[in-house]
From Swiss-Prot:
GO terms for molecular function: copper chaperone activity; copper ion binding. Disulfide bonds join 23-52, 33-42. Residues 20-60 form the CHCH domain. SUPFAM superfamilies: Cysteine alpha-hairpin motif (SSF47072). Pfam families: COX17. InterPro entries: Cys_alpha_HP_mot_SF (IPR009069), Cyt_c_oxidase_Cu-chaperone (IPR007745). It is found in: Mitochondrion intermembrane space. PROSITE patterns: CHCH. This is Cytochrome c oxidase copper chaperone. The gene is cox17. The keyword Ribosomal protein does not apply. One of its GO terms (biological process) is mitochondrial cytochrome c oxidase assembly. A motif (Cx9C motif 2) lies at residues 42-52. A motif (Cx9C motif 1) lies at residues 23-33. It comes from Dictyostelium discoideum (Social amoeba).
Amino acid sequence: MSIAETNTTTEVAAPKKKMCCACPETKKVRDECIVANGEEKCAALIELHKVCLRKEGFDV
């Protein structure tokens, strides 16, 4: 492997946490909304949680 290949592979950061442990604040609010109101009424909270997960390095 050349130096150029090594640098390319190290640029991709792996998530530091498991998905189940990432973004506990948005996960809790999202889950409570889904239980109380149903998934279709919580789309905004679901999307906020996905944004948080993406910031943590997950591909969702």
